[in-house]
Amino acid sequence: MGQKVHPHGFRLGISTDWKSRWFADKLYKDYIGEDVKIRRMMSKGLERAGISKVDIERTRDRVRVDIHTARPGIVIGRKGAEADRIRGKLEKLTGKQVQLNIIEVKSPESDAQLVAQGVAEQLSSRVSFRRAMRKAMQSAMKNPVCKGIRVQVSGRLGGAEMSRTEFYREGRVPLHTLRANIEYGFFEARTTFGRIGVKVWIYKGDAVPGRETPAEAPSRPRRERGDRSERPRRGRSGSSGTTAGGTEAGRAAATTIAQAAETPSGEPVDADAVASAATQPAETQQEG
C-alpha cells in the first residue's frame, strides 16, 4: 500500500516555509531539542488556547517565539500575567532573552490544526464521530478560501472492538500537486476506549503564482483559410484520402445527375453515361 507523505515537509521551499528558522553547526542537536521542548510545553500547558502552530527564530543572543492562537486572551492572561509566565519559562529553558509574539488566527474554522483539535474535543465529549466530522467540514467549506477538505479518524470508533479508519472528503484535495497550498493538522482524542487519531487536510488553492493549470493553458490560434500557403499540394489531399482528380470526377457526376433530374419525366436517363462520368477522373487544364 502507498503511504501518504507529510504535506508540509513535502512542499518545503515550494509553497510552505520552515517552522524553525536558524542556523547552527555544533549546536544543531541542542537547538533541535530545545525546539521540541518549547512546542511540547505550548501544547501541554495551553490546551484551551487553540494553538495552531509555533514558529521559532534564533539569533546569536535572542530567541523569537511566535504563537499562532485562536484565543489570544487565554495566552496573554489578565494584564499580561500569563504571557510573562510563559516568557519566564522559555528564558529558563533556553538561557537566552526571549521575544514572545502572540498572533491571532483570523479564521479558525479553516485552519487544519484547529479543525483537528475541534473534532478531537468533540470525540472526547462522546459526540458521534460522523456528526463531528460533517460539522467540521460544513464550517470549513463556508469560508471561500477553503477549496476542499478531508477529515480522517482512526481508532476504536464508537467503542468497537476492532479499530478502523474512516474519512470524509468534500471538494478537491490534490495531495500530489506540489504547487497546491494544503494545510495539514493532527490531534489525538483521549476517550474511555482508547486514543482516536484525527487528521485534517485543507486545500486553499495554488500557492505558486505564474503557473498556468492545464485547463487554463492558452490554445494554439486556428488558421483561417486565407492564411494557408499558396503552394499547390501534391499527392493525397485531406484526411479522407481523395485525390484532386477524384474530387473533380465527383463534381462532374453530381452535375450530370442534377441535369438528368431536370429532364422531363417522359425522357429516359442514360445510366451508363452517369456511371462513366463518376468513375473517370477530370482532365487538368494545366499543361507542361
Swiss-Prot record:
One of its GO terms (molecular function) is structural constituent of ribosome. Residues 249-264 have a biased composition (Low complexity). One of its GO terms (biological process) is translation. Residues 209-288 are annotated as: Disordered. Residues 219-232 have a biased composition (Basic and acidic residues). The keyword RNA-binding applies. Keywords: Ribonucleoprotein, Ribosomal protein, RNA-binding, rRNA-binding. GO terms for cellular component: cytosolic small ribosomal subunit. Residues 277-288 have a biased composition (Polar residues). Residues 38-106 form the KH type-2 domain. Belongs to the universal ribosomal protein uS3 family. Binds the lower part of the 30S subunit head. Binds mRNA in the 70S ribosome, positioning it for translation. Part of the 30S ribosomal subunit. Forms a tight complex with proteins S10 and S14. This is Small ribosomal subunit protein uS3. It comes from Salinispora arenicola (strain CNS-205). The lineage of its organism: Bacteria, Bacillati, Actinomycetota, Actinomycetes, Micromonosporales.
